[in-house]
UniProtKB/Swiss-Prot annotation:
Zn(2+) binds at H130, H134, E204. Belongs to the peptidase M48B family. It comes from Persephonella marina (strain DSM 14350 / EX-H1). It is a multi-pass membrane protein. This is Protease HtpX homolog. The active site is at E131. The gene is htpX.
């Protein structure tokens, strides 16, 4: 069901992008916007993983340095029925993890030094299972496409606004065109953000459920989420300096905490609800 919802939401997001192109340049603008979207998605497909890893200065962990971690990831990947992803370490005290890569054969799981310091092996196993679930469900590609189109919508809306301000006062545009571009400038990025949130939240719940099945212990992930949520609040000032807002949706827990506005527009569902669902899943499995 969440797959159908994701396809529909991506369709709406693409339609919004084409509409922005049409408002800027009519039929020609819509065609240009379409090919621009295709080019950006091509770029996101091939290079988004490299950009994310470089942003966090992540380095691949050789097997010799952490054989226990490699063995854990290999076991979880076997349970999920996918190839073992490469493992990277991001040198930051913020405890978090994310997955990236264009498909299961070219995937990466990245953990921070902070998460290795605060989680027990079983809790870390739950987190890694969640990230492997994202790879199995191909959420990485979907989130990259959604983020790319969403960013492009904001850019097009801004272009439309400023082109009406400085592009002359021909009769075809006039005050009506200015009002239309102003509405697009304000509403299009908000609509794109809401759609991205809906996609991301839906797939986080799915990754929690799939991850719990992969590691066969929902409580491991639930307890990890409790610790990570607490740490996210404690380290919010550090995260504000180190975390790029454009990549926060990739993390297992949103590291950007603080304001009520940030919570309102969070790409993650409430951690408390995620934990509640995992405890309910554990009860059904007889783990509690």
């Amino acid at each position: 069901m969440h797959t159908i919802k994701t396809v529909l939401l991506l369709g709406v997001l693409t339609g919004l992008f084409l509409l922005a192109g049409k408002i800027i340049g009519g039929q020609t603008g819509m065609i240009i916007a379409f090919f621009f979207a295709m080019a950006m998605n091509f770029f996101a497909y091939w290079f988004s993983d490299k950009m994310a890893l470089k942003m966090y200065r992540a380095q691949e962990i050789p097997y010799e340095e952490a054989p226990w971690l490699h063995d854990m990831v290999a076991e979880l990947a076997r349970n999920a029925g996918i190839p073992k992803p490469r493992i990277y370490l991001a040198p930051t005290e913020i405890p978090n993890a994310f997955a990236t890569g264009r498909n299961p054969k070219n995937a990466v799981v990245a953990v921070t030094s902070g998460i290795l310091n605060i989680l027990s092996p079983e809790e870390l196993r739950g987190v890694l299972a969640h990230e492997i679930a994202h790879i199995k469900n191909r959420d990485i590609l979907i989130s990259s496409i959604a983020a790319t189109i969403g960013g492009a919508i904001s850019m097009l809306a801004e272009m439309a606004f400023w082109s009406n301000i400085f592009g002359g006062n021909d009769e075809d545009n006039g005050i009506g065109g200015l009002i239309g571009s102003l509405l697009l400038f304000i509403l299009a990025p908000i609509a794109a953000m809401i759609i991205q949130m809906a996609i991301s939240r839906s797939r986080e719940y799915a990754a929690d459920a799939t991850g719990a099945e992969i590691c066969r212990c929902p409580l491991s992930l639930a307890k990890a989420l409790e610790k990570l949520e607490m740490a996210a609040h404690q380290l919010a000032p550090v995260a504000a300096r180190e975390v790029n807002p454009g990549t926060a949706h990739m993390m297992i827990v949103n590291p950007l905490k603080g304001s009520s506005i940030a919570s309102l527009f969070s790409t993650h569902p409430p951690t408390e609800e995620r934990i509640r669902r995992l405890y309910e899943m554990a009860r059904r499995m007889g783990s509690v």
